[in-house]
């Protein structure tokens, strides 16, 4: 046995940990670029809460609130330009995966020159970035736990990760208390993404003992708590009786949030595989929500790959009360149904005419994901799998 495990991230997990943001930020300077989406952090009051703590500690700040879902390379460059012009010492991200990923690009390009796409495609490298502090407000992408920042080039539609240790957050403030403002459909999407991260890391070619232990634990948490939590949040949004009592709700939020962070951590080392490799072209082309795309793709992907490692896929299936790896795809479809997610690409606006572009783009942005998949897969196989999703 031989492996390496290195993940220099400071996870600060707990209820109301966000109130300590100034203490965590103080070692990194006296002025922060705060990166958010356009409205949600302000509407929830979290932005004002963070700013109040920074003000009390005499830490200056400037706001960049132009990040949308599926963040663009151009947006990251705009944020980096603002960080430079305002002489910011650090970046603080408040939001979901899109905000955290874009903040990583901002922190990186604030101290590096040239075309960000050169770094994304490894034509250039750097291990420098502004210090980054993240406050995730969704429990799905796990961006708080790794050195990946997924960005889309608006000119080409290429959706691919900027990857380096410099953009691993210096501090990740993982606070279950700030997750409660998520609408049900967002929780469903990000929660399924978290599940996919752990499944793919657990079954990847580069899986190893540490990632196996973490991912296995995270899947057990999600198998137990994700659907009940979603049903509770949905019931509350619809004015219906609560599904969970207060004690159960606290445990569910903690468990799903922790599993999400673990998912981000394990993919930093063990990577993702076929489903993510096929989804990034889809959300690069149509700007669909990542977790929604995975809900269509992951069941098909595991049905293709399970025979290459029946022991691990079988262990996963049994976590969902199914018999062996051959049943994992069906287990995931039941979860997709319970989360009210989409089941085919047609519903997401795709036609079969899109398949050639999707297949070609897999080999532009996701060759590493394909190589990390335990089953051998060809271009014709990928084309056939896309066809199954209509």
Which residue stretches match the model-derived regions?
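Carboxylate- and glycine-rich phosphate/diphosphate-binding segment that chelates Mg2+/Mn2+
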Residues: 148-270
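ATP/NTP phosphate-donor binding region
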Residues: 1-90, 345
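Short glycine/serine/threonine-rich phosphate/pyrophosphate-binding segments
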Residues: 18-21, 43-46, 73-74, 98-104, ...
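Glycine/threonine-rich beta-strand-loop-alpha-helix active-site module
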Residues: 74-177
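Glycine-rich phosphate/pyrophosphate-binding beta-alpha loops
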Residues: 140, 261-294, 368-369
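Active-site pocket-lining segment
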Residues: 287-346
């Amino acid at each position: 046995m031989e492996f390496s495990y290195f993940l220099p991230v400071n996870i600060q997990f707990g209820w109301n940990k966000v109130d300590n943001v100034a203490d965590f930020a103080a070692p990194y300077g006296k002025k922060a670029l705060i990166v958010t989406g356009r409205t949600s952090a302000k509407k929830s009051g979290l932005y004002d809460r963070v700013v109040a703590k920074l003000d009390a500690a005499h830490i200056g700040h400037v706001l960049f609130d132009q990040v949308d879902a599926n963040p663009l390379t151009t947006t990251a460059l705009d944020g980096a330009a603002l960080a430079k012009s305002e002489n910011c010492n650090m970046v603080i991200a408040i939001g979901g995966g899109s905000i955290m990923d874009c903040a990583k690009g901002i922190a990186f390009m604030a101290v590096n020159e040239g075309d960000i796409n050169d770094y994304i495609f490894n034509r250039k490298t750097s291990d420098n970035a502004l210090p980054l502090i993240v406050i995730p407000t969704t429990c799905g992408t796990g961006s708080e736990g790794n050195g990946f920042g997924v960005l889309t080039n608006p000119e080409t539609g290429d959706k691919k990760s900027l990857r380096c240790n410099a953009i691993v957050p210096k501090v990740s403030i993982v606070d279950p208390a700030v997750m409660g403002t998520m609408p049900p459909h967002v929780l469903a999407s990000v929660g399924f993404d978290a599940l996919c991260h752990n499944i793919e890391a657990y079954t990847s070619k580069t899986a190893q003992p540490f990632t196996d232990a973490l991912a296995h634990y995270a899947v057990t948490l999600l198998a137990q708590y994700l659907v009940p939590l979603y049903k509770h949040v949905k019931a509350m949004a619809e004015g219906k009786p609560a599904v969970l009592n207060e004690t159960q709700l606290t445990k569910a939020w903690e468990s799903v949030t922790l599993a999400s962070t673990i998912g981000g951590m394990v993919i930093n080392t063990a990577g993702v595989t076929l489903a993510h490799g096929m989804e990034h072209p889809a959300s690069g082309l149509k700007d669909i929500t990542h977790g929604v795309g995975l809900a269509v793709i992951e069941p098909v992907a595991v049905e293709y790959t399970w025979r290459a490692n029946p022991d691990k896929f079988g262990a996963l299936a049994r976590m969902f009360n199914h018999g062996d790896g051959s049943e994992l795809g069906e287990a995931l479809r039941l979860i997709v149904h319970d989360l009210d997610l989409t089941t085919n690409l047609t519903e997401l606006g795709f036609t079969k005419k899109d398949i050639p572009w999707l297949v070609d783009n897999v080999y532009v942005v996701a060759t590493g994901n394909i190589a990390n998949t335990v089953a051998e897969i060809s271009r014709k196989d990928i084309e056939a799998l896309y066809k199954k999703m209509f």
